């Protein structure tokens, strides 16, 4: 039976810990007092430096704006104030402490994750000589991995999160066939996974809406701050010890101020509407991840990923109407419908040409900075490359999202309820094909297929993966196999139209392949878990 919901991930930035109402009132009053003092001292400079702040009537969101804004500078509280406040309220948690807690938990979670993966691989492929099944993996995860994490963290939510993370990343069939390696990770990039537990105290995620602010309470309860600071480590402002008895969970304030300024906040569909429904309790979350920011300027920030089940949007599609999507180089995406003349194609492969330019620019920067930017570490030397990579990733994601929306609109307009796509997993193993090498090098086809598949499933359209064998050589009219029409022939003749040797049927090569893919007689291939 098909599910009526689809799992979606919402990404929000953690602003700061949210304490009791009394502590929050003291902090807000102190910020307002300092803002008034700064306003009286700098009356002449306020209009020039804080014009945006005064127009928007809200506080700055980016770090550049905060550094240039006198209001934000004045509202920034120092360590002396927090030390004094910590003496009055010992249970209060502030940003420096919560950041250190996240860092310690992230490091220990990554260690358990890597250790469990290595031991699981050893038990199956070294000791067991490759003889294992899904039940034995589940037995190891329940008995060894979960027990080890629960003993270390004294937290069932993190232990269950690590177990599910290892289970999803440990692909037994791919490891047996040597299609992939062991998916170990670094502690800087590893998230802190938490799974909602049933029963008991402080086991779930309590989400509340206080003065239109998104507040989530999560069961982190096992760390507390030592009063004594180690004299041998004066650079560390806080030192932590692990306690056996879990105190109250930590409340976190999530960033929604920038989203509230957008027009989408007042709409009933979209990401902003889903965030509002989570805040109001309409959508429930059972899995979250705390992760360090990955973009430039967000390395010191912490992000929270919430997994929610969103109901599918009913567009009145017909499952008996079958469509097909062909992936190519000259035309990146071509859509066709079985026994129909409607078609849709994205003719200009902007992403392919953009990636080629990015690779060329990357080579120029590497050659240019070979003897420059030296003496300050690899991070400083490769900073231009990192900036270029992030720009290209943002462009790629936006372009793929636009293509996915256009394809979804085409199939919804034609009431298509089933879409067949090529299973391109075999392209990982074929190194002798020029087409495969070219496609993998400049075009993230897997990411594009996943995005299109997710977008179509949102509207209740079923996805079927079919084998890509001879879809470009077969005539969509008579079914004759034209062996001459291979990729070398198409490349030599500058990607000509397809012409059948038997019935002289002539059509665009990518559209002919899309028609073959939309054939309901093709056998579906199930992807390996």
Swiss-Prot record:
One of its GO terms (molecular function) is endonuclease activity. Zn(2+) 2 binds at residues 475, 478, 500, 503. It comes from the Archaea. Residues 322-473 are annotated as: RuvC-I. Residues 313-321 are annotated as: Linker. Residues 96-192 are annotated as: Recognition domain (REC). Changing residue 197 to A: About 30% cleavage of target dsDNA. Changing residue 118 to R: Almost complete loss of target dsDNA cleavage. The active site is at 326, 422, 490, 510. Its EC number is 3.1.-.-. The requirement for a perfect match in the middle of the heteroduplex, joined with its lack of a PAM, allows its use in detection of single-nucleotide polymorphisms (a DETECTR assay). The tracrRNA-crRNA can be replaced by a single guide RNA (sgRNA). Its inability to protect against plasmid transformation suggests there are elements missing in E.coli which prevents its use in more classic genome editing. Optimum temperature for dsDNA cleavage is 46 degrees Celsius and occurs between 37-52 degrees Celsius, no cleavage at 55 degrees Celsius. Optimum temperature for ssDNA cleavage is 45-55 degrees Celsius. Changing residue 487 to A: About 60% cleavage of target dsDNA. Target ssDNA cleavage is inhibited by EDTA. Activity is maximal with 5-50 mM NaCl, is less efficient at higher NaCl concentrations. Residues 474-508 are annotated as: Target nucleic acid-binding (TNB). Its cofactor is Mg(2+); Zn(2+). Residues 509-529 are annotated as: RuvC-II. InterPro entries: Cas12f1-like_TNB. Part of a type V-F CRISPR-Cas system. Belongs to the CRISPR-associated endonuclease Cas12f family. An asymmetric homodimer. Guide RNA is probably required for dimerization. This is CRISPR-associated endodeoxyribonuclease Cas12f1. It comes from Uncultured archaeon. The lineage of its organism: Archaea, environmental samples. The gene is cas12f.
């Amino acid at each position: 039976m098909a599910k009526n919901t689809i799992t979606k991930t919402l990404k929000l930035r953690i602003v700061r810990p949210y304490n009791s109402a009394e502590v929050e009132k003291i902090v807000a009053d102190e910020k307002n007092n300092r803002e008034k003092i700064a306003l009286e001292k700098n009356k002449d400079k306020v209009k020039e430096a804080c014009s945006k702040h005064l127009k928007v009537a809200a506080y700055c969101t980016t770090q550049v704006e905060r550094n240039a804004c006198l209001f934000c500078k004045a509202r920034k509280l120092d360590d002396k104030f927090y030390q004094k406040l910590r003496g009055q309220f010992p249970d209060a948690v502030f940003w420096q402490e919560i950041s250190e807690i996240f860092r310690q938990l992230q490091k220990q979670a990554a260690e358990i994750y890597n250790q469990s993966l290595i031991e699981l691989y050893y038990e199956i492929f070294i000791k067991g000589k490759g003889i294992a099944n899904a039940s034995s993996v589940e037995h190891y995860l329940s008995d060894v991995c979960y027990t080890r994490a629960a003993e270390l963290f004294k937290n069932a939510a993190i232990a269950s999160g690590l177990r599910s993370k290892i289970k999803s990343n440990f692909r037994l069939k791919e490891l047996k066939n040597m299609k992939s390696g062991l998916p170990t990770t670094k502690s800087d990039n590893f998230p802190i996974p938490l799974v909602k537990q049933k029963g008991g105290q402080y086991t779930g995620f309590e989400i509340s809406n206080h003065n239109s602010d998104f507040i989530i309470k999560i069961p982190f309860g096992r760390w507390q701050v030592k009063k004594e600071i180690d004299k041998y480590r004066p650079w560390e402002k806080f030192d932590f010890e692990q306690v056996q008895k879990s105190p109250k969970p930590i409340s976190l304030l999530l960033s929604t101020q920038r989203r509230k300024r957008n027009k989408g906040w007042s709409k009933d569909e979209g990401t902003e509407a889903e965030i509002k429904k989570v805040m109001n309790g309409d959508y429930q979350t059972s899995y979250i991840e705390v992760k360090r920011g990955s973009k430039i300027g967000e390395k010191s920030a912490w992000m929270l990923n919430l997994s929610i089940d969103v109901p599918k949007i009913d567009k009145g599609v017909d499952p008996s109407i079958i469509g097909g999507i062909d992936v190519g180089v000259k035309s990146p995406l071509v859509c066709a419908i079985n026994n129909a003349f409607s078609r849709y194609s994205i003719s200009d492969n902007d992403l392919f040409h953009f990636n080629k330019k990015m690779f060329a620019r990357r080579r120029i920067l590497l050659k240019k900075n070979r003897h420059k930017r030296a003496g300050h570490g690899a991070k400083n030397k490769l900073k231009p490359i990192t900036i270029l990579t992030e720009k290209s990733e943002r462009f790629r994601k936006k372009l793929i999202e636009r293509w996915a929306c256009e394809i979804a609109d085409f199939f919804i307009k034609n009431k298509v309820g089933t879409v067949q796509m090529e299973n391109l997993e075999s392209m990982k193993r074929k190194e002798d094909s020029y087409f495969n090498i070219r496609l993998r090098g400049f075009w993230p086809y897997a990411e594009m297929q996943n995005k299109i598949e997710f977008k179509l499933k949102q509207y209740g359209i079923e996805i079927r993966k079919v084998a890509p064998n001879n879809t470009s050589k077969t005539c969509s009219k008579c079914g004759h196999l034209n062996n001459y029409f291979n990729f070398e022939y198409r490349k030599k003749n500058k990607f000509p139209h397809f012409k059948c040797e038997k019935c002289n049927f002539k059509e665009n090569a990518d559209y002919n392949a899309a028609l073959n893919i939309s054939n309901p007689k093709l056998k579906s291939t199930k992807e390996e878990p």
